[in-house]
């Protein structure tokens, strides 16, 4: 029930429907099932929309309408009396939040239109108005709100900023690291610290590897609930726990025993084959069979009696026994077919080999790890202290501050918990533990609504942990009192051809071990409508593989990259789709796993005339050729003795010196100087005093004179003009901006150059001046291996899309090509010198000196890199986590398709059959095989091989070079031009002619009334003043910038410690202060400070206000005393609107504005306006604002029918307040 007030001030009572009971929900589900609607909601969607009063986890498969469910649930909450501002709604991205807000807005508009109840219309309109302020956004955005509001409770200023530029973060990190490193190198424990650094960097002079270790540990800790506690309690967890054989986890022992038993079983299956040859010709057992039987029996016995025969303490002995028992090779051959029976067991034995030796040396590395722990803790504290001093933070800092505020302030936490009716989270599978902690603190324990799909968790590199979702899923299924699980399985996006192949692939591939979830009936995709089940034979999924048996060398030098032949296969299929099926290019999307090596795709498509749009590559703005040329030009202007920059400038198209020219210049050396720079040689060459003046011919001399004259001009201008103007002078003097327009990718190149000028302008606006500072900033960015954001140019709409799989998440496309399926998964992380784990902490490779173990006496040391036991445990978990994420990445890619999916790769046709043992061992591919295969393509081929008797809903085809000839690929069909002899074309031409006549008439009408067309409906006095101002004073031409949105892409690192206060902000604050200042009290500093607290401005602006000057106005001027004497007649910040007639078009328009102050008496009016402009003589401002005050006076006269007898300007921009009568 809600109370509103009607026009008479009487209360209106709105009665809302109660939330639905479980019985009512079942009744609604039945009604929906029996209804004749074309698009019905599923029973699970209805349950997810209307269930209330408990925690709910919605597991929403791809295309199941999760956004629809969220919007409908939010609307239902609103219709049942829950205000939108009482819902916390978290989305993964800002874009998702914007789309969700728009959908809610459209729903509210629709509901208002349908509602006949006046009271409900008023309520829904209020909800619509509140939508902009509702908590719908990312967790980062919400955390910023909390810290801005309550940061004072933990000593954090509300006036902070976010360091979004990685370059700025790296510069600060480097400063903190260097200082701390120096301190640790000179402390008491310095020898241990040096050993730590050498373990990772090899020596103490090169600290890059150790610095990477520290940064990674710091970054990893930031994703935990409490970084400091994690570093103190969990960082060395595995190092403290796993020190003996007995400490090895039972799970790892079980995996070893399982591998032994599986090997025995597989070997038995092989020996039972008809062609194996158990018996000799004489009828006795063959030697091979006898040996294999012994292996089978012993492996089975050791597995069965492990605890009695070995136990954990005897694990090292077991490893030696098994290693001695089985052959060194992996395969058993039967009838020329190789079966990799022993491969998995060999891999497991390798993991446990040399355990005793490793454990013996592992204890020596513990002091090093303690030093590392101390360093990372100290780094975290010092880095945070610097950020607090700068009042500039990373997003993770702000979230941790928000968590700290809620944990340490019970009243604040309870106020949020009481305020939010429900805490809703989208993409829950991609949350990390820091975000989970924040959500827990906001919830009252039974009002969480979480939507996600663990099969689409693909952001592990952002420390997202799918196990958060998984744990909730298990808990709610086992303990229903904790919450409810609702499965959305129906897919409303894809045709059955896509759904069937997805189910076939992942039912054989995904389980808890690899993928983190068993792909069973609970998770399989089901068509949501009958139309999706209509079969299309030509849309069957295709695995198209370029046969690399006779590779023509088209593959890139890195074997991981996509080859020209693979791209040609894609081009051929697209041409076929476009020509034969009429599929528009924008319906086709190419998905790749990374942005690297995509240039070959664009190049090949250009050859075939296929338009393509990419989502961008790695940030390479500063490495683009045109920008590098300009940067070297600026470096040369700053310091001509920089040989590298000077050579780059001379070789650039601006001056076009060739190798011969440079060689001749280089020989003009002064023999008396040891070091001679190129610039000096040029100067000597020009005056003929070089070592070989005869080499400088007239043409070269002319070029050198032009260069020196131009450079001198630029250097002189750099001292006087702005960076922006200098860059444009370079463009214009040497026509470089025009030159790049004639090159490939001209639009992008010109946009890059334009952006450079804008970035230079922004740099100077931020308070820095000069060429040297700008170059230094750019070089700092490059030193930290970073770059500036790329410049986006308008892309064609009718084009094939190329994007990463990550970028495609949440989107859908009719036809999807998954490219480079033969690319190996990146396993770089599992080969690093350290591996981090949330539970186990850090595991490292230890550089041990085994000189004593070997009995070596001649060498000083014998260093061996050992994988410590914690490292091995973390490595195994990381390997499985990596494979699981790659599997989910494939799921995301496949489920983007609406109609058809293609897999593109390359393989040797003759060797592709050797991928797997075709013996079917169950519903899933064997775990060992899934761990062994490291490409999408290998997974698909293994499934096709092992489950060949099933319909897997995809075909495997090998493409030969003969299939990729120009004739075989074909060409795009272009639309036929109009035939003037065709009557239909002639009729169409007549229609176009009539349309052109109509356009001509409209154009003439527009010309006649051009002044009225361009006349704004509403204008302000400031706009009218601007029309007169150019006639009154000389002004400069401002720099044209496209839009504020484009400028945001060009943000430079913010190194300034002081926030620059704009003059407009000071003026706005002064007007607010003069509005709220109580004139009934004596005007003094205290009165002004009290009033200052009430205005809505940041602290920097408030500090910039000169309160003494304001006090002087009221105390020392007659007008200020007039304010206090006649305060009852005073009106402040008064809006007005009058009708005016434009003198040119004679059309009427509305003039609106706000008058700072006026005094209304019985027979006259006194007008006052405050100005904070800087000035030399008051007469300047009198002329500038005379027209504006006349408009104000006219408005007051029209309104009150009284004359304005006095008009005053109060000038606050000088040394003291001055009053000017206008």
Swiss-Prot record:
Asked if the record carries the keyword RNA-binding, the reply is no
Recorded GO CC terms: cytosol; DNA helicase complex
Q: Which cofactor does it need?
A: Mg(2+)
Q: Which UniProt keywords apply?
A: ATP-binding, DNA damage, DNA repair, DNA-binding, Exonuclease, Helicase, Hydrolase, Isomerase, Nuclease, Nucleotide-binding
Gene Ontology BP terms: double-strand break repair via homologous recombination
Q: Identify the residues that the record assigns to the UvrD-like helicase C-terminal domain, covering every copy.
A: 524-810
- Which amino acid positions bind ATP, per UniProt? 60-67
| Entry EC no(s) | 3.1.-.-, 5.6.2.4
Ranges for domain UvrD-like helicase ATP-binding:
39-495
Which reaction equations make up its catalytic activity?
Answer: Couples ATP hydrolysis with the unwinding of duplex DNA by translocating in the 3'-5' direction; ATP + H2O = ADP + phosphate + H(+)
Q: Name one GO molecular function term.
A: 3'-5' exonuclease activity
Purpose of the protein: The heterodimer acts as both an ATP-dependent DNA helicase and an ATP-dependent, dual-direction single-stranded exonuclease. Recognizes the chi site generating a DNA molecule suitable for the initiation of homologous recombination. The AddA nuclease domain is required for chi fragment generation; this subunit has the helicase and 3' -> 5' nuclease activities.
Protein family per UniProt: Belongs to the helicase family. AddA subfamily.
Outline the subunit composition.
Heterodimer of AddA and AddB/RexB.
Can you say what this protein is called? ATP-dependent helicase/nuclease subunit A
